[in-house]
Amino acid sequence: MKNLTDSFVYLGHWPSAGSFGFNTDILATNPINLSVVFGVLIFFGKGVLNDLLDNRKQRILNTIRNSEELREGAIQQLENARARLRKVETEADQFRVNGYSEIEREKLNLINSTYKTLKQLENYKNETILFEQQRTINQVRERVFQQALQGAIGTLNSCLSHELHLRTINANIGMFGTMKEITD
């Protein structure tokens, strides 16, 4: 039993210069395997992510176009309000004697309400853009994480064979037996 354990211990200590052998130190090989898996995922997943980002970009651009159309509608409303204001000013000249202060108050209310409407539309456009950007970023993060996790699981499943698993268990049992004999 001790010879079997020693043979596994010596497998892990083969000289690295000029030779090729099995690396049985699983903790040392996992970062290398993970870096290879991530490299492959990034290399092959780049096209998928670019397509996803292009789709999101188109949605954001469509949202911006819609917001611009709303803005143009607000500008049209502002022009209508200005035309109405000119009409009110004309009527104000006619009724100046009867109620100059009332007309001025209506004019200010009209300008303020139009300004508030325009500001609300601008805020809505900005909030929509921020929301779409954040949603796109979150979806891309989730998809990348899922693809990386699936790739890592697939790599781990393909690397572990039944025989290697049993040999590792037997070697560890042998080491624990040796440690128990030493402590007794």
Curated annotation (Swiss-Prot):
Membrane topology, from the record: Single-pass membrane protein
Chain segments annotated as transmembrane: 27-49
Classification via PANTHER family: ATP SYNTHASE SUBUNIT B, CHLOROPLASTIC
One Gene Ontology cellular component: chloroplast thylakoid membrane
InterPro entries tied to this protein: ATP_synth_b/b'su_bac/chlpt
Subunit comment: F-type ATPases have 2 components, F(1) - the catalytic core - and F(0) - the membrane proton channel. F(1) has five subunits: alpha(3), beta(3), gamma(1), delta(1), epsilon(1). F(0) has four main subunits: a(1), b(1), b'(1) and c(10-14). The alpha and beta chains form an alternating ring which encloses part of the gamma chain. F(1) is attached to F(0) by a central stalk formed by the gamma and epsilon chains, while a peripheral stalk is formed by the delta, b and b' chains.
Task performed by this protein: F(1)F(0) ATP synthase produces ATP from ADP in the presence of a proton or sodium gradient. F-type ATPases consist of two structural domains, F(1) containing the extramembraneous catalytic core and F(0) containing the membrane proton channel, linked together by a central stalk and a peripheral stalk. During catalysis, ATP synthesis in the catalytic domain of F(1) is coupled via a rotary mechanism of the central stalk subunits to proton translocation. Component of the F(0) channel, it forms part of the peripheral stalk, linking F(1) to F(0).
GO molecular function, a single term: proton-transporting ATP synthase activity, rotational mechanism
Cell compartments where the protein resides: Plastid, Chloroplast thylakoid membrane
Recorded superkingdom: Eukaryota
Secretion signal span: none
Protein name listed in UniProt: ATP synthase subunit b, chloroplastic
